[in-house]
Structures are given as C-alpha cells and as structure tokens.
Curated annotation (Swiss-Prot):
<feature type="binding site">
    <location>
        <position position="98"/>
    </location>
    <ligand>
        <name>S-adenosyl-L-methionine</name>
    </ligand>
</feature>
<feature type="binding site">
    <location>
        <position position="92"/>
    </location>
    <ligand>
        <name>S-adenosyl-L-methionine</name>
    </ligand>
</feature>
<feature type="region of interest" description="Interaction with host proteins TAB2, TAB3 and ZRANB3">
    <location>
        <begin position="49"/>
        <end position="52"/>
    </location>
</feature>
<dbReference type="GO" id="GO:0030430">
    <property type="term" value="C:host cell cytoplasm"/>
</dbReference>
<dbReference type="GO" id="GO:0008168">
    <property type="term" value="F:methyltransferase activity"/>
</dbReference>
<dbReference type="GO" id="GO:0085034">
    <property type="term" value="P:symbiont-mediated suppression of host NF-kappaB cascade"/>
</dbReference>
<comment type="subunit">
    <text>Monomer.</text>
</comment>
<keyword id="KW-0964">Secreted</keyword>
<feature type="binding site">
    <location>
        <position position="111"/>
    </location>
    <ligand>
        <name>S-adenosyl-L-methionine</name>
    </ligand>
</feature>
<comment type="function">
    <text>Cysteine methyltransferase effector that inhibits host cell NF-kappa-B activation by preventing nuclear translocation of host protein RELA/p65. Acts by mediating cysteine methylation of host proteins TAB2 and TAB3: methylation of a conserved cysteine residue of the RanBP2-type zinc finger (NZF) of TAB2 and TAB3 disrupts zinc-binding, thereby inactivating the ubiquitin chain-binding activity of TAB2 and TAB3, leading to NF-kappa-B inactivation. Also mediates cysteine methylation of host protein ZRANB3, inactivating its ability to bind ubiquitin chains.</text>
</comment>
<dbReference type="GO" id="GO:0090729">
    <property type="term" value="F:toxin activity"/>
</dbReference>
<keyword id="KW-0800">Toxin</keyword>
<keyword id="KW-0489">Methyltransferase</keyword>
<keyword id="KW-1035">Host cytoplasm</keyword>
<keyword id="KW-0843">Virulence</keyword>
<keyword id="KW-0808">Transferase</keyword>
<comment type="similarity">
    <text>Belongs to the NleE/OspZ family.</text>
</comment>
Length: 230
C-alpha cells in the first residue's frame, strides 16, 4: 500500500531558507535520511549544497520562481462551483494543465508528477486557499513524486483522491499477479481494468474515456498477435 501524505490544510507562506523545513511543511513524514543525502540532479535546479539539510535555496530558481508561480496561480484561482462539467484529456495532459484545471474550478481533483520535492509549483499550490495535495513516491523511480491535488471546498475532492489512491494500489497488485508477463503487457492489462473509473475520477469526457480504452484494447491485440507469430 502506498502511504500518501496530505499537506497541512492551511500551509502558511514560508519565511525561511531552511531546506529541510520547507519540505516537511508540505510532506511531514518524509524520511529523515532523505535530508542527509546529496541533492540529486533535479534538486540542484532549486537548492545548492553538499547535503539537502545543509543546502541553500536558490534565490532566482526557487524563491523568486515560487513567488511568480504563486501570483500566477492566484490570478487563475476560482471558488469551487456547485457542479463540474467534463473536461478534455488534452486540458490536463501536462502538469500545469492538471493542477490548473483544479485551482480554476473545472474539476475537483487532478494528478501530476514532480522530479523534486523542491519544485516551486508544488510549494506554491500548497499555499492556495482550499487546495490540498497528497504526495507519495512514484514506484520504481528514484526521484519522481506523484502529486494528487484536490479541492477542500468540494466533498468530491478528497473522496476522488482517496479512490484514486485505491485504484493505484489495485493496479500495482494486478501487475504483481501478472509478474510473469512482459512489462508492456502488464502495464496495458492493468490499465484496461482501471481506465474507465480512473477517467471518471479525473472528470474526462465519456467519449474520450471510450476512445482511450479502445486504444488500449487495440494495443493489447497487437501485442498478442506479435506473440502468436513468435
């Protein structure tokens, strides 16, 4: 089971250069040993130092960039509507689109990944009113983190977030059951099983969900056809 951590409901603006504190502020249960490690190549975009707990925040790349991103997010922020309408997958196909559709009130929940816990967008999001994030490491990756961003002012926000996490675990369990299959086949089979409900959680239009599932089924058929030839 993954162990996501929800950020504090109201994360206050950070007036410190302590690189350990700013991460714990949004991800309280991060392992202590994480800060004794050297910054990875992605962290180095935002901090500099021998270890993370001894590092300094970069003025332009983190502090100023977070301020710019937070100002932009505030201009795009909208209170939660009473009803949500389906969105196109294209609107959420990149990280900014994923969180922008949430903070602008188009949908109650979205998901994206960051390559560093010092990513300015992540820290800016956590300072917005009625916006929360759940964070957990991406499986089989040394640096990626999955961020589930959701609305606190809609009951659908956390409900959908929790169900997303359940489906994520289900997919992992399916892939474990299929451990003797090829990585490609495991990925497609598990995706087909959860694709419809996952698409509905993300508020995608039903016709786009249908199209995506057909695409996955076609890929599955192509793989099976190749395997039958060999």
């Amino acid at each position: 089971m993954i162990s996501p951590i929800k950020n504090i409901k109201n994360v206050f603006p950070i007036n410190t250069a302590n690189t350990e504190y700013i991460v714990r502020n949004i991800y309280p249960r991060v392992e202590h040993g994480y800060f004794n490690e050297s910054p990875n190549i992605y962290d180095k975009k935002y901090i500099s130092g021998i270890t993370r707990n001894m590092a300094q925040l970069k003025i332009e790349e983190f502090i100023n960039e977070k301020s710019r991103r937070l100002n932009y997010m505030k201009t795009m922020y909208s209170p939660c509507p009473e009803d949500f309408q389906p969105i196109s997958r294209d609107e959420a196909s990149i990280p900014e689109g994923s969180w922008l559709t949430v903070i602008s009130g188009k949908r109650p929940m979205g998901q994206f990944s960051v390559d560093s816990l010092y990513h300015p967008d992540l820290h800016a999001l956590c300072e917005l009113p009625e916006i929360s994030c759940k964070i957990f490491p991406k499986e089989n990756s040394d640096f990626l983190y999955i961020i589930v961003v959701f609305r606190n002012d809609s009951p659908q926000g956390e409900l959908r977030t929790n169900r997303f996490i359940e489906l994520y675990d289900i997919k992992r369990e399916i892939m474990q059951v299929l451990r003797d299959e090829s990585p490609e086949l495991k990925s497609i089979k598990s995706e087909i099983i959860i694709a419809r409900e996952m698409g509905e959680l993300f508020s995608y239009a039903s016709e786009e969900i249908d199209s995506y599932i057909k695409q996955m089924n076609d890929r599955f058929s192509q793989i099976k056809a190749r395997m039958s030839v060999t």
